[in-house]
Amino acid sequence: MTNQPYYETMYILRPTIPEDEVDSHLKKYTEILESAGGEVLDSQMRGKRRLAYPIGKHKEGIYVQLSHQGDGQHIAVLEKAMRLTEDVIRYLTVKQDGPLPAKRVVKTSEKNVKEDKEVENKETTTEDKDQKGDLKETKKSENKDSVTEAEGQKDIKEAKEIENKEIEKKED
């Protein structure tokens, strides 16, 4: 199956479904794909999120993403199963280009996402001495975005230095 294209299917479940039923839906669609000749490469529960626009009477939905590989015939079987259940309020399958995703199964609940955000935006308080020897309190933010931005600036600076060196070599 390595020469076959791979696909990503994102589907949205009703927000009122209990978490154990969400797991059973994921297992059900994985079995349907495999029985139709496809291979599941990755599955991710994205959790409950607000919809961009209401679908039916729902303003929220539980997002699930499936990455799968096959000859394309398995997609019709999967989408037919999704169309026939009332729990799936929307689905979309897209053919992907590029390298295959790593094969894994990740389940993320809403509680874990909130805990991760709290850890990412954690502030620490440290005591530093100023020049006079007096203690002063400083706060250091450990926001991942600021670290990523700083690393990005460093990468840009390094790239410019390399580019300048290459220009100097060409001039010599």
Curated annotation (Swiss-Prot):
The answer to whether keyword Ribonucleoprotein applies is: yes
Q: Which residues form the signal peptide?
A: none
Extract the GO molecular function terms from the UniProt entry. Answer: small ribosomal subunit rRNA binding; structural constituent of ribosome
Q: Please give one Pfam family short name.
A: Ribosomal_S6
Q: Which of UniProt's keywords are assigned here?
A: Ribonucleoprotein, Ribosomal protein, RNA-binding, rRNA-binding
User: What GO terms fall under cellular component here?
Assistant: cytoplasm; ribonucleoprotein complex; ribosome
UniProt region (Disordered), positions on chain: 100-172
* GO annotation terms (biological process): translation
Composition-biased stretches, type Basic and acidic residues, lie in 107-172
HAMAP family in the record, alphabetically? Ribosomal_bS6
What family is this? Belongs to the bacterial ribosomal protein bS6 family.
According to its UniProt entry, what is the function of this protein? Binds together with bS18 to 16S ribosomal RNA.
Instruction: Write down what this protein is called.
Output: Small ribosomal subunit protein bS6
The species this protein was found in:
Prochlorococcus marinus (strain MIT 9211)
- Please state the gene responsible for encoding this protein: rpsF
